[in-house]
Structure formats: C-alpha cells, structure tokens
Amino acid sequence: MKKTFFTKDPSFYRSFFKLMTVIALQNLVAYSVNMLDNIMLGSYSQNALSGAATVNQIYFIVNQIALAIGNALIAISSQYWGSHQTKPIRKVTKAALLFSLAIAAGIIALCIRIPNTLIGLFTTSPDIIREGTTYLHIIQWTFLFFMISNLLLAMLRSVETVKIAFLISVISLLVNGGINYILIFGRFGAPEMGIRGAAIGTFAARILELGIVLFYVWKKDTKVKLFDEKFRDGIIGKGSGTVWKTFFKVCIPILTSGLLWAVSLPMQTAILGHLSADAIAANSVSSTFFQYLKVIVIAIAGASAVVIGKDIGSNGEEKVRCNGRTLSVLYLAIGLLLGTVLFLLRSPLLSMYRLTPQATLYADHFMIIMSVIMVGMSYQMPVGVGIIQGGGDTKFSMYLNLISVWCIVMPLSFLAAFYWKLPVELVVIAVQSDQIFKCLPIFLRFKSYKWIHKLTAID
C-alpha cells in the first residue's frame, strides 16, 4: 500500500469506533452491576456490604485471570481473523477454555476447603468473615460460569462480533438487580435473605449469561463455528503441541502482568486507607467518577487489540504502522477530551455529595490531578495494551508493569505516605504516577515497531 502517516480508510474508522462504542457500553453496564450490588447491600447492612466486598477481592483476582486469558485469545485469534482462517481460532479457543476451567476448578477448591482463611486475608472482623463466608459459599460457583462466558465473548470479539456481549450485560443487570431487590429485602412475599439473596441474584445472572452465550455460539455464530468439530480436535493428540505452545507464549506474560497489577491494588488501597478520614472520603468520591471515564479508555484498548491483530494477520505491515500511528493520535485527542470533561464537571459532581469542607477541598484537588492522569492513561493504556500487547509483544508489557508498579510506584507511594509524610495530594500523585511516566517507554517501544509479532503458527 502507498505509505501515508495517517490512514484515510473510512472502513478502519467505522470498525474501530463501532467496537469501541459497544465495548464501552458493555463495560459501563458491567460496572453498574457492581455499583448496584454495593448500593443495595449498603442500604441493608454494613456487615453484609463489607462481607461482599471482601469476597469481591477474590472475584477481582478471578476477573483479572479471565481478562488476561481473554486478551491472549484475542491477540492470537484476531490475527487469524485477518488472514481469513477460522480453524486455528477454534483450536486456540478450546485451549483457552481448558486452561480457564483448570484455574477455575483450583480456585473453587480453595474456596471450599479454606473459605475463612481466604476471607481472613482481607479482614479480621468475625462478623464480616461470617457474612463473607455465606456469600462465598454461593458465589464461588459463578467463577466457573464467568470464566467460560468471558472466554467465549473474547472469541466473538476477536472476529468483531460484539453486540451480543452488550445485550448479555444489560440482561445481567436487570436480572441481578431484580432478584437482589426481591431476595435481599424480602419483597413480594419472598423471604428476607440479606447477603444470601445478593449471592443468589449474582448466581442466577451468571447462569443466564452463560446460557445465552452458549446458545449464540452454538446456534447463531456463523464466523467461528466452534461446535462444528469435536472438542478434543486440535488440542489433544497429534499436532496439539503448536497450539499450546503458541497460546502459553502469549498468555503467560499477560497473565503475569495482570496478576502483578491486581496484587498491587489492595496495597495501594491500604496506603490511601491510612490517610485522614476526609482524604479517604474524597478519594472514594473522585475515584468513582474517574472509573466511569476509565471504562472508555479500557474500551479503546480492547477495540485497538482487535483491529491491530486483524491488520497483522492480513500481512500488511505498513498498514499496521499507519493504523497504529492514527490510533496513537486519536488516543491523545480522546484523553484530552476526557481530562477536560472531568476537570470542568468536578464542581457540579461534587455538589451532589454531603462532604465536610476539607473533604470537598481534597476531592476537588484529587479530580484536578485525575484530569491530568486521565490524559496519560488514555495514551499509555491503549498503546501498551491495545497496540503493543495486541500486536503480539506481550513480554514488554509484563516487564514494564513489573518495573513501574513494583520498583517505582509502590516504594514511592509508601515513602510519600509514611516516611516523608507528604500532603495527601502528593500521595495520590505518587500512587497514580505510573499512568504518566509509562508514556515515554511505551512511546519509544511503539516507534520501534518491534511489537509487530506474527502469531499465526497454528495450522
């Protein structure tokens, strides 16, 4: 193709923005499901809310594992989609499913054998542990359903089928919210079940999600046709070595990176939790609005991984470079827009809360900081995860996260909070600093184009 700095292909923009919009809506609905659970349990009982929150720490780890395996599947499958091959997609999807099932089984076994020990990692309160154990007893089975659903939806996303995921998220929100309302509070003649009712609502929603996605993949999907052959074909026996080697080569670095980040979050929360009560309240409020805008950034990264992988699979390296440059500039523009929105809306948003004057001042300062952080995150996350990792270079992201989070951010945050005892605004900057300084190494790696890795070795 003729060398140009930015792509002029309208189909590229249509594909990218379609994927981004649907993924963003799906993520927004999924985030709202968690918010709804917290609101309902919070209005029922503080111990119930805290018990569910501790179990959600375990679910967060499961979620990160599922996302990592799904991202690995997308990185590989999108390249085959670009080269119009679907048989290898079926093989690598089945490998990812088997790996996910093994991990889910291991986590569920731990939840059955040592539930109190697991929950005790996050709290020492006997009342909260009791509520959390009740919740975990039901929720643990949803880990399996969630991992299967997530993998099948990742497979569909890799071939640019995304609307079904949004539909499932909406149905899940309605079902979960409805059952929660009835069973938590005992409405319409149902027994008042408290935290058990919330767990049953989540269980029912996850079962329904899995049922819908299985039906869609089996009966409606005309692209991959996952069930057109025996499940063992290609992943057990002759020729299966290449499938597993390719999958683990991509998956292990992504999984390691995700787990390193997931483990760091509770530690960052603990650092912020040692600040004053006003600072903790301010951080909670500002983080809520920040997370809603972050949903858009995550969607951008997800859409980018699909379009870049598809371009690599079609053997158009110059096209990959051109589209990558176009996307990187789009990221900056979107980041500036999101940062400006957060900055301008901070006063109207804060007016909805009843905070102390000091907490309001802190929240205002935090949202100004988050406005700048948003610009950096809107660039580094989509380039790092969407383009570089989506292009097959998974080890770079792993090493970058290892160094930035564990060698810089965590020590810096600890020193800022406990040794130097800096103002709370500077502590928040330290905790979020990787969103800014990762931009430089990510930009340099992107400009080298060494992230373009061909992953299509499966027959």
Mark where each language-model region is:
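Transmembrane alpha-helix boundary and packing residues in multipass membrane permease domains
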Residues: 23, 27, 38-39, 75, ...
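Alpha-helical transmembrane segments and their lipid-water interface positions
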Residues: 30, 34-37, 41, 63-70, ...
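Short runs within selected transmembrane alpha-helices of multi-pass transporters and secretion channels
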Residues: 70, 139-158, 165-176, 198-214, ...
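Small-residue-rich hydrophobic transmembrane alpha-helices
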Residues: 49-109, 146-165, 269, 280-346, ...
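Short alpha-helical transmembrane segments in multi-pass integral membrane proteins
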Residues: 1-23, 77-144, 191-251, 308-374, ...
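Helix-terminus/linker motif at the lipid-water interface of multi-pass membrane proteins
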Residues: 28, 32-50, 119-126, 182-193, ...
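Interfacial/gating helices of multi-pass transporter permease domains
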Residues: 41-60, 126-131, 195-196, 242-250, ...
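Transmembrane helical elements of multi-pass membrane transporters/channels
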Residues: 18-37, 138, 149, 172, ...
